């Protein structure tokens, strides 16, 4: 199963514009050269994309308590913010937070588990490779996995190699 995700740094903290307004503008200028390669910055917003088993790119978003994947972005600002993420350091681990909802991503504890969103923080390890791929692993060794159609990402036993990775 492919576990490739992209974390693309969108922009630093914006004081006067809404996140969704800036997101639409910034996303249009993002290139593959903008992907994160080994460092996460505070006050930076990200989109997370993954490749499904049919080699189609999907963008992760919070769909009211469950992480989903979409092959396109919404056109309204309210929905767009659910596609934007931050990564917050919690010592030696990371918490993945959705900007639109403020909820934290929680990977399941076994293969095929749904990826939920909640108020509870889950510590995740980030493993980078030199090509901009990152594996997000929870304490049970589960990583995000795209299903064949990409609509419902789940968890699967991950590795710190490109085949078990996402691009951020």
Give, region by region, the residue ranges found by the protein language model.
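Bacterial Sec-dependent N-terminal signal peptides
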Residues: 1-22
């Amino acid at each position: 199963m492919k576990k490739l995700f992209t974390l693309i740094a969108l922009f630093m903290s914006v004081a006067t514009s809404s996140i969704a307004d800036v997101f639409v503008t910034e996303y249009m200028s993002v290139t593959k050269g903008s992907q994160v390669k080994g460092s996460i910055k505070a006050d930076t917003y990200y989109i997370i994309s993954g490749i499904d088993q049919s080699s189609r790119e999907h963008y992760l978003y919070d769909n009211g308590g469950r992480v989903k994947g979409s092959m396109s972005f919404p056109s309204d600002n309210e929905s767009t913010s659910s596609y934007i993420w931050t990564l917050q350091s919690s010592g030696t681990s990371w918490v993945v937070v959705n900007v639109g909802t403020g909820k934290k991503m929680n990977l399941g504890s076994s293969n095929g588990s749904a990826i939920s969103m909640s108020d509870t923080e889950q510590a995740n390890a980030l493993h980078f490779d030199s090509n901009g791929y990152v594996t997000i692993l929870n304490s049970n060794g589960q990583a995000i996995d795209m299903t064949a159609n990409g609509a419902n990402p789940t968890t699967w036993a991950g590795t710190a190699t490109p085949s078990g990775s996402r691009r951020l």
